[in-house]
Amino acid sequence: GKNKAIYQNETVGNAGWAILNGTGDTLTVVFDVPTTHVYANSGHLGPHHGNQANTWHGIGGTIDPGTTFTAHSGGCVECHMGPESGHSFNAVEGNCQVTGCHSSSKQDYMDGVFDRMQVIGAALDAAHAIHLDDPTGDYAYGNVHPLYGSHDRDTFNAMWNFLVILEDRSMGAHNPTYIQALLTEIESLLGI
């Protein structure tokens, strides 16, 4: 009948690629994307949430498998997931059995990640791969979204890795080795 949904591509269903046509017309949209490119078909494109766990284990980016951060074998979890803080990951000093974790050198490292994310974010924005919703915001903590479009694979992979770091929100603290590798990979892919 008239209200019956018609999928132009039955094999993928309503997965973003399909054309849902509830009018009964036979309208068709064809995306002719060369094999050298990837089509971004959602403003929610990117790694699925759980990025802190993925970063922790060194997975999720285009350089899998990464390196599991050795500090995770004890210290961080002891302080951040102790019985007093519940599952909030807010540090409670009473849990802490380790010293020197959040020294000025750690903050300097995180500031460096932040600075690199600004340069990378601006390059991806200029390539129309992402968009920063608030022009007064920043690319590390701002409201950043992927843009619809056909992107060459290097730009797409750079965007994906950028989103892994962005959604982790730790500026590298969850796995410095892996985040450095992702940043270096992104810069190489974008030529910056």
Task: List PLM regions with ranges.
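C-type cytochrome heme-c attachment and multiheme electron-transfer modules
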Residues: 1-192
